[in-house]
Amino acid sequence: MDIFRLDILRHGETELSHTLRGSTDDALTAKGWQHMQQTIETELSLYGVSSQPLWDVIVSSELQRCRLFAFELSEKLMLPLQVNPQFQEMHFGDWEAVDTQQIYAQSPELLTQFWEKPTQFAPPNAETMQQFQQRVVFGLDSLIQQAQEHQWQRVLLISHGGVIKLLKCLALQQPLDDILKMSAELGQLNSFIIHSSNKIRLMEQNK
């Protein structure tokens, strides 16, 4: 049995989009903000006019590239907002806010290993892929529990590419080493159906 639909909006372009910014708290560019706004407006227009809101609640990563947009949207739509650090992007350690070309110039072998086998190789002083998975799944389990308690039908989560890619791996039952092969475009929505058995299913249009 389905519990609720989870729409995840990835933040738009940021000031450091050319780098690995995981826990780095950089701001959206004007283009990035507008991209997110257009995506939400498109989704609302597809839903049409109704006395009921499209979402029951908005949940956001605590990083400003998600949180500030989420706050403004919650005010506009008059929806409750929760800020949950469990849905923050992966922490890249010494590679935080560093251009990938610079990383490749300094540590080509480690970067290649990380791209190919992220469960076995992590950036120096970074969160491991297993730690990242554990954190995000913990956040999802908490969200599922709240959805059951409050009978939420549809939740909007404003989060990051890594979170979306991880949930796609889980939904498609792909190995975690495939996470970097998954798509998660800036400023775009990806939708999942959460089942009562805590299973997650990716909606067809997002495959």
Over which residues does each language-model region extend?
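Phosphate-handling substructures
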Residues: E75-V137
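Conserved histidine-centered catalytic loops in small-molecule metabolism enzymes
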Residues: D2, S50-Q86, T112, I193-K207
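Short beta-strand scaffold positions
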Residues: S60-S61, Q134, I158-S159
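Active-site-proximal alpha-helix that buttresses catalytic centers in soluble enzyme cores
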Residues: L9-L79
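Active-site-adjacent alpha-helix immediately C-terminal to a catalytic or transition-state-stabilizing loop
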Residues: R67, F138-M203
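Short, hydrophobic/glycine-enriched beta-strand segments
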Residues: R5-H11, L157-I158
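Generic structural signal for well-ordered alpha-helical scaffold segments
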Residues: Q37-G48, Q133, V137-Q148
